[in-house]
Every structure is written in structure tokens, then in C-alpha cells.
Amino acid sequence: MRIDVLTIFPEYLDPLRHALLGKAIEQGKLAVGVHDLRQWATDAHKSVDDSPYGGGPGMVMKPEVWGPALDDVSSGTASTQDLQSALPHLSKPRHDDIHGVEARSYGESEDSDKPLLIVPTPAGKPFTQADAQAWSAEEHIVFACGRYEGIDQRVVDDAQQRYRVREVSIGDYVLIGGEVAALVIAEAVVRLIPGVLGNRRSHEEDSFSDGLLEGPSYTKPREWRDLQVPDVLTSGDHARVDRWRREQSLARTWQRRPELLDAAELSDADRAYLETLEED
């Protein structure tokens, strides 16, 4: 996969070289280019914004800058050095690489030669785990990180000639710019590229992978500050452990995100357990 990011703060995207994404770069599964949008500004001040038509507060990012930038990135003519991994020591396998199962994709990318353009915006469609799974099969993803009052809408409209455009929100709140959202989405997507995480079960059992929140996790020691690991987890009875984990997942979802239960695939045993929670 290749990821390109257009931003006026290239340094903000340095985390893309670290941790899991750095590992993917080191493995050759990911290439990342971060582009300074001001390279395409033509005035002496390298300005990228102007006042909005119709009046109002704030500034709007200019189409004369964004248009050529997106043109160059889509055609591969933008000049930038790809990020280098900050983790050059990852030639050694880690525990989740050793015990993994066969890597395979979650699906195929959309049948199109156009790159996927993601525009983070609070006015966008909510980003979901299903999006992350689908986009993990993409060959080329471009992030357009807006600032101020956003990007001139004509940029988004025009980009549809060269891209498959998705305006996406990561939550019902407003950030200063799209860089944080780009980091969030990139990590959610890249970790699902086959072979990046190592053990496929690590993300098959994640929150939202089956429509529910993930339950609590425990490790050694068995007792810590007078708090015990639940006995069922040390029982050796795998069927009991699986059922306990399922019930914990159901309970946490019921308590924190009950609306998710409407779309989740629930067994008769699941429904019976939820009824006991409601009775309590």
C-alpha cells in the first residue's frame, strides 16, 4: 500500500514512521509520502487560504493550491522523499509474529484505477471498522488534511475526476485540522494489511470486529494490589473462557454502547444473557 498525505504541517505526520506503521514500512508493505501543501502556493507569502465568500468567521483553503497538489499526487509527479521507518531493528520476530495464522486480506479494493482520497472533516460520514477493513485492501490512499474552516468545496468536487473521494469524520467533535484524523485512520487501516500485525487473531477479536466492544484483558501476576484475575481465565476450560469473554463483551457493549446491539449478530445464548442484565 502507498499512503500520501497533503498538509501544511508535515512534521505533524512523523508518527507515521513509528510503531506499527514504521514496522509496515520496514517490512516493505507500506510506503508513505508526506507533502507540504505550501509547495503549490504561488504567491510570495506561500498562502494557502483566503476569506470565505458570503462572509463569516475564519478562512477557507484555496482551490488554486489544492487542485495542482492533488493533480501531482494522483499522477505520481509530486516531489517528496518517502518516510523512513523509525524502527530499523524490526528484523527480529516479535511474539505476535511467531504465533500468527496465515495472512489474508479482508477483501478486495474497489474496481477502479483511481486512488482513494480521504478528506477528514466533522461534516463527513462516520469512520467505522468496516471502512478500515475495506480500505486495507487499497493500493493507494491519499489524505487531504484541511485547516481553518476547511477546503473549498470545489476542490472535493473536482477531485472526483481523478479520485474516489470519501469525506470522513472520526467523531462528533471538531479538531484544529485533519492531521490527527489522518493518523487515526491510517493506523486503523494499516494494522489490517495482511502480515502487518502478525497474529490475525489480534484484530479478529478487536472491539467492533463482530459488532461488539471487546471485554477486559488480564496478564500476570494473578494477584495485584488485592485484585484477582477472574478464576475462569485460569481454569484451563477453553469453552468456559470463550463464553466468559463473550458475556463480558456483551455486558460492556450493553453498558457503554447499547445501540451497537441492534446490528450485532446475537445467538440465543447471547440474548438470554442480555435479558439477565436487563433484569438486574
UniProtKB/Swiss-Prot annotation:
Its EC number is 2.1.1.228. One of its GO terms (cellular component) is cytosol. Residues 74-84 have a biased composition (Polar residues). S-adenosyl-L-methionine binds at residues 146, 170-175. It comes from the Bacteria. It catalyses: guanosine(37) in tRNA + S-adenosyl-L-methionine = N(1)-methylguanosine(37) in tRNA + S-adenosyl-L-homocysteine + H(+). Keywords: Cytoplasm, Methyltransferase, S-adenosyl-L-methionine, Transferase, tRNA processing. GO terms for biological process: tRNA N1-guanine methylation. Specifically methylates guanosine-37 in various tRNAs. Homodimer. Belongs to the RNA methyltransferase TrmD family. This is tRNA (guanine-N(1)-)-methyltransferase. The lineage of its organism: Bacteria, Bacillati, Actinomycetota, Actinomycetes, Mycobacteriales.
